[in-house]
């Protein structure tokens, strides 16, 4: 089977819509070609947050749920909503894996470590879930509880960890001082996902080895000291509690990792559980002690096959007949292309949790989805992406144009990470450069794919970010938004429906463009108006 006109889904990560403002990097970048696209082709303002992507009302969207819904064609109740329900009903205290972990700790007279991103951002985690497990452990009779906290500052305002941890200390006091904050680490270190193992090693030392790493005697003083040297929550240097020097993770201990979103939990969790994981062959871990075979590790959700612990509190239920899977069954040839930072998003997440591409790292002969191929473009090795706001967008486009010229693919999924990853740095001017870079790349792609190869581009985003770099309090905003996002379709011969456009309707719309029947699993309709 071959489609008449190939489709290219271009996902501009973190590219939202907002009123003109000094903090609107999208608008201030003067994306001339995008303006031309909007004047030439039909386009919509679409929902990409809250109930439209399976999240609680008014919850900002994120890259994971955005890509899931772009490929799903249905609203999928997401991890945050599920775990909020489990917490509200206290079912989390009855979860089989969690209860068995309590039993394990009591049997071994060992420590229970609660590790995760401690914030209310709701993108990777929510501290309510960790606190619920903490309270359940106390009820179960566990008294040796260690908190290995990861601070946020990226999906929240930059400096909220102080107040969050102050409240946790008060909660510990209210519970007869059961529990201690054993270590702290900014997510820059503990939640790296780009194989920067030197960062992971510092976090690992704070949790496990207690050597060659900072320490503190008062966690709140330590955070204040970090703030004074312009380290916000994301960048807090890992440290352990001197009053809990022997409270490091050790043999017979258990650790519950409370992050529910996989991508930034994979690396540190794989290091903690899998001696064959590539980090252990790196220079950063050449002299580290591995204890993963002597502990019980529980993840809230399935992260990756590289996390070798079998203990998953809420095992996944991957979606069926997502766009990529459906096109594969029909014999259509497809390509996924992105840089390292977002390769999992155009594979694992876009495929509804089905790991056909080994979380984006598979070689083409290892892909288990028929007729599917991948181009992984390395991300730049820089400390933060405002140092290179172009990221790897030009290199992605160069490779994509090579692929387009082959005339082989019926469907291409492309991710440009710039608006999101540079937006997360809080650097407004750098984010404007990032947006302008994408404007230039879109023109290159359009001129080749649409004008020379008769293709149709569907240009959209997974969530907002770069359009609000300064919040209503005139503070730097590094987090995602609830903004609407554009959907531009480069076909002058169609009209688009204006009733409740949403990114979850992109998959059926693409099938409609291909003149292919929409499967029953895709419960949402196409946005093309045939009247």
UniProtKB/Swiss-Prot annotation:
Keyword annotations of the record: Glycolysis, Isomerase, Manganese, Metal-binding
Keyword Isomerase: yes
Residues at the active site: 63
A Pfam family hit: Metalloenzyme
Upper lineage: Bacteria, Bacillati, Mycoplasmatota, Mollicutes, Mycoplasmataceae
Binding sites annotated in the UniProt record for substrate: 124, 154-155, 187, 193, 261-264, 342
Role, per record: Catalyzes the interconversion of 2-phosphoglycerate and 3-phosphoglycerate.
Organism encoding this protein: Mycoplasma capricolum subsp. capricolum (strain California kid / ATCC 27343 / NCTC 10154)
The protein's annotated pathway: Carbohydrate degradation; glycolysis; pyruvate from D-glyceraldehyde 3-phosphate: step 3/5
Catalytic activity: (2R)-2-phosphoglycerate = (2R)-3-phosphoglycerate
Enzyme Commission (EC) number: 5.4.2.12
Binding site for Mn(2+) 1: 420, 424, 480
Cofactor binding annotation: Binds 2 manganese ions per subunit.
Gene giving rise to this polypeptide: gpmI
A single GO molecular function term of this UniProt record: manganese ion binding
Complex and partners: Monomer.
GO cellular component: cytosol
Binding site for Mn(2+) 2: 13, 63, 462-463
Gene Ontology BP annotations: glucose catabolic process; glycolytic process
PANTHER family reported in the protein's UniProt record: 2,3-BISPHOSPHOGLYCERATE-INDEPENDENT PHOSPHOGLYCERATE MUTASE (PTHR31637:SF0)
Protein name per UniProt: 2,3-bisphosphoglycerate-independent phosphoglycerate mutase
């Amino acid at each position: 089977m071959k489609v008449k006109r190939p489709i290219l889904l271009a996902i501009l990560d973190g590219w939202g819509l907002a009123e003109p403002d000094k903090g609107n990097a999208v608008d201030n970048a003067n994306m001339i070609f995008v303006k031309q696209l909007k004047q030439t082709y039909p386009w919509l303002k679409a929902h990409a947050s809250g109930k439209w992507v399976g999240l609680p009302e008014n919850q900002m969207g994120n890259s994971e749920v955005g890509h899931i819904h772009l490929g799903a064609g249905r609203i999928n109740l997401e991890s945050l909503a599920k775990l909020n329900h489990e917490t509200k009903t206290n079912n989390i205290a009855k979860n089989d894996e969690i209860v068995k972990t309590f039993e394990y700790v009591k049997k071994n007279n060992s420590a229970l470590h609660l590790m995760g991103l401690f914030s209310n951002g709701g993108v990777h985690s929510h501290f309510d879930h960790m606190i619920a497990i903490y309270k359940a452990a106390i009820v179960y009779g566990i008294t040796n509880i260690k908190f290995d906290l990861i601070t946020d500052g990226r999906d929240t305002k930059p400096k909220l960890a102080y107040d969050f941890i102050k409240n946790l200390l008060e909660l510990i006091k209210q519970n007869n001082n059961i529990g201690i904050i054993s270590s702290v680490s900014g997510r820059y270190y503990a939640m790296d996902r780009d194989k920067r193992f030197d960062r992971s090693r510092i976090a690992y030392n704070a949790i496990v080895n207690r050597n060659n790493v900072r320490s503190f005697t008062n966690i709140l003083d330590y955070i204040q000291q970090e703030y004074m040297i312009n380290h916000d929550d994301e960048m807090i240097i890992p440290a352990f509690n001197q009053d809990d020097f022997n409270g490091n993770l050790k043999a017979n201990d258990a650790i519950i990792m409370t992050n529910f979103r996989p991508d930034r939990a994979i690396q540190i969790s794989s290091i903690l559980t899998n001696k064959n994981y590539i980090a252990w062959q790196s220079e950063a871990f050449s002299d580290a002690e591995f204890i993963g075979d002597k502990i019980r590790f529980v993840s809230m959700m399935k992260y990756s096959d590289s996390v070798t612990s079998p203990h998953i509190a809420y095992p996944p239920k991957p979606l069926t007949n997502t766009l990529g899977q459906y096109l594969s069954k029909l014999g259509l040839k497809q390509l996924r292309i992105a840089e390292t930072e977002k390769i999992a998003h155009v594979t694992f997440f876009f495929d509804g949790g089905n790991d056909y591409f080994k979380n984006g790292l598979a070689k083409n002969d290892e892909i288990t989805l028929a007729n599917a191929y991948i181009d992984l473009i390395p991300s730049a090795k820089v400390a933060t992406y405002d140092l290179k706001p172009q990221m790897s967008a030009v290199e992605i486009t160069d490779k994509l144009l090579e692929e387009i010229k082959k005339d082989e693919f019926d469907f291409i999924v492309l991710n440009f990470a710039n608006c999101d990853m540079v937006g997360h740095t809080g650097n407004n001017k750098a984010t404007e450069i990032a947006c302008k870079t994408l404007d230039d790349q879109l023109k290159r792609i359009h001129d080749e794919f649409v004008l020379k190869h008769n293709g149709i581009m569907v240009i959209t985003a997974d969530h907002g970010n770069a359009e609000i770099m300064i919040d209503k309090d005139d503070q730097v905003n590094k987090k995602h938004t609830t903004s609407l996002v554009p959907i531009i379709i480069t076909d002058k011969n169609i009209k688009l429906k204006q009733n409740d456009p949403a990114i979850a309707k992109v998959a059926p719309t693409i099938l409609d463009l291909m003149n292919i029947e929409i499967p029953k699993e895709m419960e949402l309709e196409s946005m093309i108006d045939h009247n």
